[in-house]
Amino acid sequence: PEALNWGYRNLAQYSGVSLGSVGYIMADLQNSGHLLDADGNWVWKDRNNTIGKWCDYYRDKLLPGIEKRRYSGTIPDNCLEYAMLPGGESAAEQLHLLKSSRLLAYRTGNINLCIAQNRWKEDIDGNIEIRTPFWPECRTFDKIPYLLIYADLLAEDDSRCTEIAGEIFNRFLSGDQ
């Protein structure tokens, strides 16, 4: 929330988008009523609703365009030591919220060694999905943001994932904290 009041240059640098894009996005958030001016500071009108709208957009527009590869294979315990960050169920498993038989990860570098060592085979219906990050290279993470974990779980359209997404929302995202 404090980032709402950063200067546009800082927001552009942090997010990896152009200064013009930051201006457009902030104007859109203000004009659509998502942001309110509270004595010179921007605040969310309904942060939870805005998160929900972003997750819908992610599922319907952004996710279909993300480059992804699917594989079948065994998921080794150390697989995330390779150039990958866990998303969705895999991230929820690291938070000890569920046990998953699938791997969803965003590659952060070359994962060919992982594929070869574990003998993963390309398979459109495989239990392993590796996605190309959709954020700019200048923006590095040591873990996937909770908002993305939440959105990935909701995009699964599975009751178990939806329940876990609710736990993540309540623990890390709810504006009622």
Regions found by a protein language model. Name each.
Residues 1-52:
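Loop-centered beta-sheet repeat module
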Residues 36-74:
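HTH-adjacent hinge/linker in prokaryotic transcriptional regulators
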Residues 58-177:
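Long, low-complexity, charge-rich intrinsically disordered regions
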